[in-house]
């Protein structure tokens, strides 16, 4: 377990007023999230919410034939399990750990109690949910209308925004599953980005070496998602900006 770990590494928790944060912190449980761990399956009853700190979780829509595609990615900016406070209790998506790390887990009844009690938490989580819905909608548009190259750029940028690093540990096969495309398409797209000097890929490890260049190659979808997130959650975006400066 990491020696210097704080629930405030999750930007949603860090954006809570001190009073609300202190009411929650003793009930937050630090848990490891191994790569590939399934936090919940489609249609399952949600018992906990998760606030990632150093992990990334993919929300996948699973078809009847078993095929799946990512509809959103959640990291240290967000929360896994929005259905709990939205009143649905279950969700049609599957939550799978995309990048191993840690998260803080909170029992569902405690989250709902605080959501009902605290107007500040209501506003924060509802604004986050709207930003998450924007990401889902834009991902659907991107998957339908943009090339695999552009989708990969968007995916890499959104993932890096949720990590305190410029490096991802990720196989091309896993990326292909997330994007819902053939592995060969990801191999070709990653090769183009590497030849352009934007990324370095080796043995399941992707390092972004030219982020401005990667953003220039991405379609509009990344900027749409980020702009809406920053508009709805300026307090959370502030914590992200500080983390990005520390990373440089």
What are these regions (language model features)?
Residues 21, 79, 111-112, 214:
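A generic structural signal for short hydrophobic patches within well-formed alpha-helices
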Residues 158-248:
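Phosphate-/nucleic-acid-contacting segments
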Residues 1-34, 79, 84-85:
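Cyclic nucleotide-binding regulatory module and flanking cytosolic helices
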